[in-house]
Amino acid sequence: MFVLGWYMHELPKGGPKVSSFDLFDLGLFTFESSKEMSARSFYFLLHKSIGVTIFFLVLFRIYWRLTHKPPKMLTSMSAFEIKLATAAHHALYLLMFLIPLSGIIMSIGSKYGIHWFGIPFLPGIDNETLRDLFKEFHEIFGQILLLFFILHFAGALKHALVNKDGVLKRMWFHK
């Protein structure tokens, strides 16, 4: 979604209308649309559709997390590492919830609303103030999530390569 978000904002407004879209112009996958639209419109619609899907998957993940106990932290981890890991996980969950929510509210604030893979989902109310405010939230939360993801990845590498304490095994599907 980060790549898609950055890519779609670089596309010019009012480009030529077509019904075939080569994903990121890489020649790997082509989308066919039943109606002609600009590339910018297509990618915004795709981003919104995937974002709504992610929002509901995150809600399910949060439900799962609340109803299933996670594995215990390793005894080799210090109290500071346990607190840091817990705080990072809470931040990741919060951001995974806030990013699509802010995107949904931003889209409702626009005049276009949200179509989920072509199906009208939520109408827009054309409120520029609401849209602009939640656009800022959406972008800031996205950047913070990217930072937390990098830190989380670095922590996992540290445990795998330096500590060699089995944290990656704990994170995976092993019991």
Residue locations for each model-derived region?
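Membrane-embedded alpha-helical bundles that constitute the cytochrome b-like, heme-associated redox core
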Residues: 1-175
